[in-house]
Amino acid sequence: MQFEMLYSKIHRAKVSDANLNYVGSITIDKTLAQSANLLAGMKVEIVNINNGERFSTYVIYGDKKGEICLNGAAARKVQIGDIIIIIAYATYTHNELEHYKPTIVQVNESNQILSITNEV
């Protein structure tokens, strides 16, 4: 049996930009994305705390420190300054769950890392 579980998340990131004319995705500061084990092209779920929207997109790495930019159609689901949660899931076998440790990255208002933990 396989279980879909939380793989990692960036908690309470602030949207720094929204680019309707870009071809989809969420641009995330590369250092921040990698601290959450998010790979370029990885599917993520976005939860907008301000308006309750939930939607899926994929990660691209950004060069700007603290950058969180929703692109394409996803740009219509956020406003600059909104607080979001970026979530990735993965599929695990029962045996893999013995060593299950999701990565939780907490950030401040500038999207700088406050803490990284492995507890749900």
UniProtKB/Swiss-Prot annotation:
It is found in: Cytoplasm. The keyword Signal does not apply. GO terms for molecular function: aspartate 1-decarboxylase activity. Substrate binds at residues 57, 72-74. Its EC number is 4.1.1.11. Its main location: cytoplasm. Belongs to the PanD family. This is Aspartate 1-decarboxylase. The lineage of its organism: Bacteria, Pseudomonadati, Campylobacterota, Epsilonproteobacteria, Campylobacterales. The gene is panD.
